[in-house]
Amino acid sequence: MVMAAKKGPGPGGGVGGSKAEAEAASEVWCRRVRELGGCSQAGNRHCFECAQRGVTYVDITVGSFVCTTCSGLLRGLNPPHRVKSISMTTFTEPEVLFLQSRGNEVCRKIWLGLFDARTSLIPDSRDPQKVKEFLQEKYEKKRWYVPPEQVKGPSYSKGSVSATPVQGSVPEGKPIRTLLGDPVPSLSDPASTSSQPGSQSQARSSSQARSSQPPSHSSTKKASTDLLADIGGDPFAAPQVVPAFASFPGFGVGQTPAHGGFANFDAFSSSPSSSTFGSLPPSVQAPFQAQPTPAGSGQMSAFGVAPLAAASQPNNLADVGGLLGPRMAAGGLPGSVFGMPSQVPALQSAVPGVSGSGGLPFGAYTNPFATPAQAQLPSTNPFQPNGLASGPGFGMSSVRPGLLQPVPPSGAFASPFSAPVFPTQAGLADQQNGSSFGDLGTSKLGQRPLSQPAGISTNPFMTGSSAFASKPPTTNPFL
């Protein structure tokens, strides 16, 4: 009955009813279009042309959702596209069904199916001219067009979809494996999560082991960089006294006084055992001290130390004399290195007014380079000759020489000689007279009394006729 009333030409009733039904149907389709425009699964929330969020128009020609700006550009194409507003127009059932079958996602597969992002670029939406040129390439020239028959339904492959970039569309979610790498545990699988505690505990223990290693490394590094750790003792303590010159054990080592003035010259002192320069006893007396020896002894000394009753105060120069002048026990004939006559008990002072035997030469001052002489004899001026019957003043006096005797080229370091070089004089109690450097081991010369005048001069700078004229020329280093 109702259907018949509507179909019938009743007065006013049928037309009004159909109009209301058409409006109701149109409202339903419009609501459906708005639902499609808000559908996020089809990518309709963003403009198909410029990817701007918030679509307001529908392109009925291609079945896509666009923004207001792009809708004006689509109308300017050739042929122009048919565009409708979502909220201000009505849609028919075929239009709604067409929009349902297309949408932005399907339109992208059709119109941008051959698009390659490596060779082509989507223009910036803020430049209308470039967007227009892009639309002309896409719709008028169909540069990247793919027939709809190849993209219908689910048969469309994902490879072609990924090859076509979507401007303004939401980027597809990438799996967490691609972002974090392969060894990523599953977040939803309960079986895998239940099996993870063991592996996590192992990983945690390994990480703790690695975290515990750096301190040990740092400690070893600290120990290795501590260069002064092995140096013992106080760095501010006084250094140990070390001799300035090394000891020469090849020449024999003798006991010498320990003084800090000079180094240990053990090279020139020897033990009673045989050495390079003969048997020399160790020195046990203070420097420049001498003990009287029995008459007739042939002991020789380096500097010919005078017999002193009391030892003088040691000093730095005295240490040298003590080190270079070793003593020898009574009865020994071998001389020292330089072979000077040793102490004489009857030695007198060279200065008038001072006791003859046992006194200090030149008073209390012991000059190792002074030349003592007899008190009754005249002064031995090195620059004038005199009538001393004794030996020369430098190195050849029978009392004691003040300087070292020049070393002749022959027999300087010979073995110990067996007989005295010179006979004893009358006033010196059988003391040997002569120098150890004068032809060691030769025959004795004739005795000469102490008061006998002779032409021997004590001036080392002048030559004179003497019994020693046959000796080789002197090599005195002070001449």
From Swiss-Prot:
Chain ranges of the Arf-GAP domain: 27-153
Sequence ranges of Polar residues compositional bias: 157-167, 454-479
Source species, domain of life: Eukaryota
C4-type zinc finger segments: 47-70
Modified residues (N6-acetyllysine): K174
Coiled coil start-end: none
Keywords (A to Z) from UniProt: Acetylation, Metal-binding, Repeat, Zinc, Zinc-finger
Region described as Disordered: 150-223, 450-479
Assembly and oligomerization: Interacts with EPS15R.
Name this polypeptide is given: Arf-GAP domain and FG repeat-containing protein 2
